[in-house]
A protein has these predicted regions:
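Subset of outer-membrane beta-barrel
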Residues: 19-274
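Hydrophobic alpha-helical segments of integral membrane proteins
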Residues: 10-12
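Generic N-terminal leader/processing signal
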Residues: 1-2, 102
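Sec/Tat signal peptide C-region and signal peptidase I cleavage site
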Residues: 14-18
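Sec-dependent signal peptide recognition
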Residues: 2-8
Length: 274
């Protein structure tokens, strides 16, 4: 009972955070992946990367945890030459969010992007809008680097809604043919609920060409469905077929800012792409 009450207080006290949706792939990687988001993940993690994945994709996701459920639908079209764009809608216990992302390549290995979020609180109906800026650079075939600044418009009002300006450095490394590593440090200069800096790191391992195993760890990293940050681990499985992708993740949260302790979550997602 105390555990559920504590979680409820966190959900009420922190109505919004930098990342409104984390896919099973992201959660399996411990919240990492900004250096190389796959398909519609770029809408939330790093809009500038959409320029490097020229597909049309539709995604539906579902996450369940101790105290509720999250639902997500998104669409992204990265096939056009002028610019690439996507839109996602997330329904959470505390609010509903519309995310938009658009990107453009400046040169073949350098992309820039802008994101927007529109958050509506379920209880009060109050609304908040903010933006993100991002850039992705493919330095070598085995090293990718991205910089993302989320919640660019920071003020006393946005801080009251837990929308702190946050800078992410997303990195992706391919040390082996079927192993990809992601490390995403973050820093929020004015974050008040815990340490200002954190990191998420994960590994994605290809098994039998179509199946993926993901392992991740976050240290003061973001926990989207709880609207806070914390410490924990993620594990995930994925299948990537010719036109469809299935993903699952399990996350164990050891502690979270705001006083909430141990909790778990499960997440499923399906994507079709052309």
């Amino acid at each position: 009972m105390l555990k559920k009450i504590s979680l409820g207080l966190i959900l009420l006290a922190t109505p919004s955070l930098a990342v409104e949706y984390q896919s099973p792939r992201t959660l399996g990687l411990g919240g990492a992946g900004r250096g190389g988001p796959l398909l519609n993940d770029s809408i939330y993690l790093n809009p500038s990367y959409a320029s490097f994945t020229p597909t049309y994709s539709l995604t539906g996701g579902y996450l369940w945890f101790d105290k509720g459920r999250n639902y997500n639908l998104s669409v992204e079209d990265s096939r056009t030459e002028m610019f690439q764009a996507g839109m996602g809608y997330t329904k959470r216990e505390q609010n509903s969010t519309l995310n938009l992302g658009a990107s453009k390549t400046l040169i073949s290995n350098l992309g820039i992007g802008v994101g927007a979020k529109y958050v509506i609180d379920n209880d009060t109906g109050s609304k908040t809008m903010n933006f993100s800026l991002s850039s992705s650079y493919i330095a070598t075939p085995w090293a990718y680097v991205s910089v993302v600044v989320d919640n660019v418009l920071e003020s006393a009002d946005t801080q009251a809604r837990n929308l702190y300006r946050t800078v992410y450095l997303g990195t992706k490394f391919l040390p082996l043919d079927k192993v990809t590593l992601y490390v995403d440090p973050l820093y929020s200069p004015n974050y008040k609920l815990g340490p200002k800096a954190g990191v998420a790191a994960g590994a994605e391992i290809t098994v039998m060409s179509d199946f993926l195993l993901r392992l991740g760890r976050f240290q003061h990293g973001e926990i989207s469905h709880l609207n806070t940050r914390g410490i924990g681990n993620g594990i995930g499985l994925g299948y990537l077929g010719p036109k469809v992708r299935f993903d699952y993740s399990f996350t164990r949260i050891n502690s979270a800012d705001g006083g909430y302790g141990l909790s778990t979550s499960n997440s499923l997602e399906t994507t079709v792409f052309f």
